[in-house]
């Protein structure tokens, strides 16, 4: 299963979130939850009028169960405006 999403959250906040998860491991620039690989990519050049909005592409790829669990955890953490 693949989840490929674009979030209006700075890369550093997302990295901090995954780094704080006891069952998530880091491997270089990627994170792993079970057999789910999590790749974070900063997106530059997105403007909302005169303001630049931080954007991060998040790609979760792996077995359906692993992807659903970690995606739900991430989604619930950052669901509210401003996370």
Question: What residue spans do the PLM features occupy?
Answer:
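Beta-strand elements of well-folded, non-transmembrane domains
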Residues: 6-9, 42-44, 62-66, 78
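A short, structured beta-strand/loop element
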Residues: 32-52
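Short Lys/Arg-enriched alpha/beta "domain-start" segment
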Residues: 1-26
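Short, intrinsically disordered, mixed-charge
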Residues: 16-23, 72-83
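C-terminal structural segments of small proteins and small subunits
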Residues: 53-80
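Short solvent-exposed loop/turn micro-motifs enriched in small/polar/acidic residues
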Residues: 23-25, 31, 53
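Broad gene-expression machinery/nucleic-acid interaction feature
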Residues: 28, 35, 55-57
């Amino acid at each position: 299963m693949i989840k490929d999403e674009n979030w209006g959250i700075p890369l550093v906040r997302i990295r901090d979130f995954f780094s704080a998860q006891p069952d998530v491991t880091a491997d270089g620039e990627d994170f792993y939850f079970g057999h789910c690989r999590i790749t974070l990519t900063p997106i530059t050049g997105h403007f909302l009028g005169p303001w630049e909005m931080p954007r991060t592409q998040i790609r979760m790829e792996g077995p359906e169960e692993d992807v659903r669990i970690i995606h739900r955890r991430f989604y619930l953490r950052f669901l509210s405006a401003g996370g």
